[in-house]
C-alpha cells in the first residue's frame, strides 16, 4: 500500500530537525520503502511517498520524529486503482 506522509514543524525546531536528519538520514525502518521525499522551499513543510503494508513500521517512523514535527499519514491510490473503485 502506498502512503503520503506529510509533515510540518514549528520554526523553533528547525535546527534540531536538521541535526537529526544529518545524523540519521531520515531513513524509513524495515518494512517501509520510501519512493521519494520533497521539502517545501522556504517553508516548514514537506512530504514523502512511501510503500509498505506494516502500519506499525509507519507509526514507528513517525514516532521517531514526533517530538519535533506533526504528521498526516494517509493511504493513496493511483488512477488505475481509483478506476476500479469507481466501476
Language model segments and positions:
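Short S/T/G/P-rich N-terminal loop/turn motif that feeds into the first structured element of a domain
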Residues: 1-45, 53-56, 77-87
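A common structural junction motif
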Residues: 25-28, 65-72
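Conserved catalytic core of Hanks-type protein kinase domains
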Residues: 51-52, 64
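Short, electropositive alpha-helical surface patch
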Residues: 58-65
